[in-house]
């Protein structure tokens, strides 16, 4: 379970980063 939870957090953080990058590109 701890590993699965950790992976989920990492994936969530990655998705958040992609959203920020996408918005940054759109702003440009």
Curated annotation (Swiss-Prot):
It comes from the Eukaryota. Its EC number is 1.1.3.-. It is an enzyme of class 1 (oxidoreductase). GO terms for molecular function: oxidoreductase activity. Its cofactor is FAD. Keywords: FAD, Flavoprotein, Lignin degradation, Oxidoreductase. GO terms for biological process: lignin catabolic process. Moderately thermostable. Has a 1.5 hour half-life at 55 degrees Celsius. Primary aromatic alcohols with methoxy substituents in position four are good substrates for VAO. Plays a central role in the biodegradation of lignin. Oxidizes veratryl alcohol to veratraldehyde reducing O(2) to H(2)O(2). This is Veratryl alcohol oxidase. It comes from Pleurotus ostreatus.
């Amino acid at each position: 379970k701890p590993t699965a939870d950790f992976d989920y957090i990492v994936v969530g953080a990655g998705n958040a980063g992609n959203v920020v990058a996408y918005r940054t590109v759109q702003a440009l």
